[in-house]
Amino acid sequence: MVGKASYVRFPLLFRPILERLMFDFDATLPLMAVQFLILTVILNALLYKPLGQALDNRDEYIRTNLQQAKERLQQATELANQYEQELAYTRREAQAIIEEARAEAQKIATAEIAAAQQALQAELMKAQAEIDQQKQATLQALEGQVSSLSEQLLAKLLA
């Protein structure tokens, strides 16, 4: 409680306020303020600065890792795009090679078919020539036989 001696120093206007206060305005108040300031300085030096520095270091670490991750993601995206372009180019080249091989095979097949047709045509002409030759030989043989038979028939009819 506030003693009567402390009222003498303060005007009567502050008396109701002072009666409600739980501590005296004496030498302990500045001592408590100094203790609070010393505690604040000690906590700042031992706790808040290292904690703040650790948080700053962690923030810098996260920021650095995030930046590196973004750079790696960008590099990976660029590589993926490059590989996709190379793959598309390779596919176009492969398709062109396939089409070229297909055209070459078609050309070879057409040439072989033409050669086979020519060979077949030559065989056919050769066979036709043989048939014509045999026909001529047969006709000549028959003409010889017809004239011989005609003479025999004429001789039998006249006889």
From Swiss-Prot:
Oxidoreductase keyword on record: no
Write out the entry's keywords from A to Z. ATP synthesis, CF(0), Hydrogen ion transport, Ion transport, Membrane, Thylakoid, Transmembrane, Transmembrane helix, Transport
Q: State the annotated membrane topology for this chain.
A: Single-pass membrane protein
Q: Which Pfam families match?
A: ATP-synt_B (PF00430)
Task: Tell me a Gene Ontology molecular-function term this record carries.
Answer: proton-transporting ATP synthase activity, rotational mechanism
Identify one Gene Ontology CC term for this UniProt entry: proton-transporting ATP synthase complex
What does the UniProt entry say about where the protein is found? Cellular thylakoid membrane
Parts of the chain that traverse the membrane? 27-47
Q: How does it assemble?
A: F-type ATPases have 2 components, F(1) - the catalytic core - and F(0) - the membrane proton channel. F(1) has five subunits: alpha(3), beta(3), gamma(1), delta(1), epsilon(1). F(0) has four main subunits: a(1), b(1), b'(1) and c(10-14). The alpha and beta chains form an alternating ring which encloses part of the gamma chain. F(1) is attached to F(0) by a central stalk formed by the gamma and epsilon chains, while a peripheral stalk is formed by the delta, b and b' chains.
**UniProt xrefs under HAMAP family:** ATP_synth_b_bprime, ATP_synth_bprime
| Family to which the UniProt record says this protein belongs | Belongs to the ATPase B chain family.
Its function, per the record, reads: F(1)F(0) ATP synthase produces ATP from ADP in the presence of a proton or sodium gradient. F-type ATPases consist of two structural domains, F(1) containing the extramembraneous catalytic core and F(0) containing the membrane proton channel, linked together by a central stalk and a peripheral stalk. During catalysis, ATP synthesis in the catalytic domain of F(1) is coupled via a rotary mechanism of the central stalk subunits to proton translocation.
Q: Which PANTHER family match?
A: ATP SYNTHASE SUBUNIT B', CHLOROPLASTIC
Which protein, by its recorded name, is this?
ATP synthase subunit b'
The protein's organism comes out as Synechococcus sp. (strain PCC 6716)
